[in-house]
Amino acid sequence: MISVSNVSMRYGAKILFDEVSTGFTPGKRYGLTGPNGAGKSTFMKLLTGELDPQKGTVVRPRKLGVLSQDQFAFDKYRVIDAVIMGNRRLWAALEEREIIYAKHEMTDADGMRLGELEGIVGEEDGYTAETDAAILLQGLDIPDEMHERKMSELPGGQKMRVLLAQALFGHPQALLLDEPTNHLDLDSIHWLKNFLNQYEGVLIVISHDRHFLNGICTHIADI
């Protein structure tokens, strides 16, 4: 669950939110609507933790799937790795494991730590991570031959599809998606609808595509 308690936010003299309290429940799919400038994206950033409220609190689950809006942030990584990075706990374990394996000599402490890391990788389905990531990429029309390329080699529209796959990866407890259908063709939108309609966590979506929202949302919140 995501819980918002007595949250207030203003920019200069403009009050965006005043003592807002609400909750978002697992199994429900929420669409945020409202005119440009109403504060939808700001509210989403408060939910993700990208912004802190000036007053009040937001309580969120540990595993969040958030659609990044920075298409250059992962340019040095392979496409498949950028998706797997959506599960931060798994990615941190994989990186640390690789560092230990690269050592010329391992200590007893390294061996013990490797055992802990293998446990994390197993808990987070790390042994099927590349397969799971590839399925998401295929659903969003990123062909197999692009999965090993660097993100920097992709055009902007395809980068945003990869970042959407990143948000969906790793069984997040909550999905927070700001305009997820941007850069998607009709087949990919249809695939995304099916995916989200089967998702069992908390889903919060901002979209100007009311037809898309009507196809996935159980609740609409107007800001």
Model-predicted segments: where are they?
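ABC ATP-binding cassette signature C-motif
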Residues: 1-223
